UniProtKB/Swiss-Prot annotation:
Annotated family: Belongs to the formate--tetrahydrofolate ligase family.
HAMAP family registered for this protein in UniProt: FTHFS
Protein name per its UniProtKB record: Formate--tetrahydrofolate ligase
Domain of life: Bacteria
Signal peptide stretch: none
Amino acids binding ATP: T65, P66, A67, G68, E69, G70, K71, T72
EC supergroup of this enzyme: ligase
GO molecular function: ATP binding; formate-tetrahydrofolate ligase activity
Gene name tied to this protein: fhs
Record keywords, A-Z: ATP-binding, Ligase, Nucleotide-binding, One-carbon metabolism
Gene Ontology process terms (BP): tetrahydrofolate interconversion
């Protein structure tokens, strides 16, 4: 089979104005970035806000292998299939981060014959949204250090600066650094560090903001440091929320692109699901709901991460109703959770596959607690044997369909689309976590009901931070748990369906502007590192300007 980039290059793209017409976006609201990409002017909301909402389909997955299980490919395929069946459907996705593109996971524009295009642009610099987030984030850092150098009127304690710098790259060497070296002209020396842009609070804010006014308000409330007299320093104290909003004025507008079958797609925003809330912008999804019958959206990593955060935090924040959830599974991931080593996953092993189905069962059981219909999509790979596929179908008690979107595009997801249409209903969804719960109750509920832990413990550092949050009145905010994506638990080595273990909260981080608290479990880091042989070694460009190796 041809590579993703070869398939993408052969696709016949339609002008973005034509794609916009298909979902009733008139030309006055289309801001083209070349022939095939456009921003959509936020003024369109006044025109469509009274339209009836379409139905929202959330795509998630079982606990993945390191390479991922094809959620994006399945999401795109499902939306294309719904369009093939005469339904008006839009897929809404996150923007790829350059870190994973050049790291182990590769791009995030789908794969095979189920892609959003133009994939080279989407996977690389796209419309500059992520760079705008980086610029806004680093402006805060620059202003903090300049403020300290020129008199420090706010009394910022350099040892209590919470705001690290950012870059959209996997670079472990930048996790902990010292800035301000080289003499007083370069500022005051202090410890600092970098996080990846997808983990920036500004990325979360961009994806949660409802409009420019809300964006500016959220930016102003970011807590960046503490003063010598223990007061919290916010962006509004630095008087730069206006400048930050200016840097983000175009980034807040949704990006319209197309699938390989010329159906519409919004690709906007890119917070990670293991260290943030893990789904595309509220603005893009709300707009898509007003413009189509069915919106297919994806939440990062497995159902214990992206889907939980979508159902407990994003949907209540945005006011979404969720009408169905699709859980992507693969024979490879099932075998992996059944104990098969990574280099043996292509070998037939029905026994291990059946054992690994416990992981899928737990995720489905968890999702049903939200009172939503759950459908399983088995993303079929060429290495899957007929016996494995037959045994999966025989033993999967949940409505399920085999998906061949990678090989066949929308045609390969028609069975899934029909199954979704059969099971979808008017939303009766309700979150598991409520605002009335205390912070500890929220964490304990997630730990026991979703992560299947027996109990929760807090390190001394976490207990101290909890007191800090209470003192400043932030303990009532929603909680986002940052943990490994490789296990339902807080330990990446605990595969399949661990239960009854101790779940440890080691620290808390405040995202006051975004409007949530991050509870850190395990050794999760906000700045990834590259692997020994990163995807970067496979990427090249020929003399004619054709990119090679991007996927």
């Amino acid at each position: 089979m041809k590579t993703d980039i070869e398939i993408a290059r052969e696709a016949k793209l339609e002008k973005i104005t034509k794609i916009a017409e298909k979902i009733d976006i008139s030309e006055e609201y289309v801001e083209p970035y070349g022939k095939y990409i456009a921003k959509v002017d936020l003024k369109i909301w006044e025109k469509v806000k009274n339209n009836k909402d379409g139905k929202l389909i959330l795509v998630t997955a079982m606990t993945p292998t390191p390479a991922g299980e094809g959620k994006t490919t399945t999401s795109i395929g499902l939306s294309m299939a719904l369009n093939r069946l005469g339904k008006k459907s839009i897929v809404t996705l996150r923007e790829p981060s350059l870190g994973p593109v050049f790291g182990i996971k590769g791009g995030a524009a789908g794969g095979g014959y189920s892609q959003v295009l133009p994939m080279e642009n989407i996977n690389l610099h796209f419309t500059g949204d992520i760079h705008a987030v980086s610029a806004a984030h680093n402006l805060i850092s620059a202003v903090i250090d300049a403020h300290i150098k020129f008199g420090n009127e706010l009394g910022i304690d350099p040892t209590r600066i919470y705001w690290k710098r950012t870059i959209d790259m996997n670079d472990r060497a930048l996790r902990n650094i010292v800035v301000g070296l080289g003499g007083s002209a370069n500022g005051q020396p202090r410890e600092d560090g970098f996080i990846i842009t997808a983990a920036s609070e500004i990325m979360a804010i961009l994806c949660l903001a409802k409009d420019l006014k809300d964006l500016k308000e959220r930016l102003s409330n970011i807590v960046v440091a503490q003063s010598y007299d223990k007061k919290l320093i916010k962006v509004k104290d630095l008087k730069i929320e206006g400048a930050l909003a200016v840097l983000l004025k175009d980034a807040i507008k949704p990006n319209l692109v197309q699938t390989i079958e010329n159906t519409p797609a919004f690709v906007h925003g890119g917070p990670f699901a293991n260290i943030a809330h893990g789904t595309n912008s509220i603005i893009a999804t709300k707009l898509a709901l007003k413009l189509s019958d069915y919106v297919v959206t994806e939440a990062g990593f497995a159902a214990d991460l992206g889907a939980e955060k979508f159902l407990d935090f994003v949907s209540p924040t945005a006011g979404y109703d969720v009408n169905a959830v699709v859980v992507v599974a693969t024979i490879k991931a099932l075998k992996y959770h059944g104990g098969v080593k990574k280099d043996e996953l292509d070998n037939e092993n029905v026994e291990a596959m059946l054992k690994g189905m416990e992981n899928l069962r737990v995720h489905v059981e968890n999702l049903k607690k939200y009172n939503v219909p759950v459908i399983v999509a088995l993303n079929v790979f060429g290495s899957d044997t007929q016996r494995e596929l037959d045994e999966f179908s025989k033993n999967c008690e949940i409505p399920h369909a085999l998906v061949y979107a990678f090989e066949k595009g929308g045609e390969g997801a028609v069975d899934l689309a029909n199954l979704v249409l059969e099971n979808i209903k008017e939303s009766q969804y309700k979150p598991l976590i409520t605002s009335e719960m205390s912070l500890e109750e929220k964490i304990e509920t997630l730990a026991k009901e979703i992560y299947r832990a027996g109990n929760v413990i807090y390190t001394d550092k976490a207990k101290s931070k909890l007191k800090f949050l209470r003192k400043h009145g932030y303990d009532t905010l929603p909680v986002i748990v940052a943990k490994t994506q490789s296990s339902i638990s807080d330990d990446p080595k605990k595969i399949n369906a661990p239960s009854g273990y101790t779940f440890t909260i080691r620290d808390f981080e405040l995202s006051a502007g975004a409007g949530f608290i991050v509870a850190l479990a395990g050794d999760i880091m906000r700045m990834p590192g590259l692997s020994k042989i990163p995807n970067a070694v496979n990427i090249d460009i020929d003399e004619e300007g054709n990119i090679i190796g991007l996927s």
